[in-house]
Amino acid sequence: MDMKKLIERINFLYKKSKEEGLTKEEKVEQQKLRREYIDIIKGNVKVQLEGVEKIPKPNRKN
């Protein structure tokens, strides 16, 4: 599932839970989708951090 559809479904289930409640199956789906979203975000952050290089500070003499 692409990120946009994933977020739309998560938001839909959240709104439904507040308005009328969720079935047991929908609660399971909501948890699964949230876990998938978190895993994607974690993966993106990991890739970003792996691409970071430390740049040494220049030596300054007064």
Curated annotation (Swiss-Prot):
It is found in: Cytoplasm. It holds the Pfam family DUF896. Keywords: Cytoplasm. Gene3D superfamilies: Helix hairpin bin. One of its GO terms (cellular component) is cytoplasm. InterPro entries: DUF896. Coiled coil: none annotated. HAMAP family: UPF0291 (MF_01103). Belongs to the UPF0291 family. This is UPF0291 protein CLM_2971. It comes from Clostridium botulinum (strain Kyoto / Type A2). The lineage of its organism: Bacteria, Bacillati, Bacillota, Clostridia, Eubacteriales.
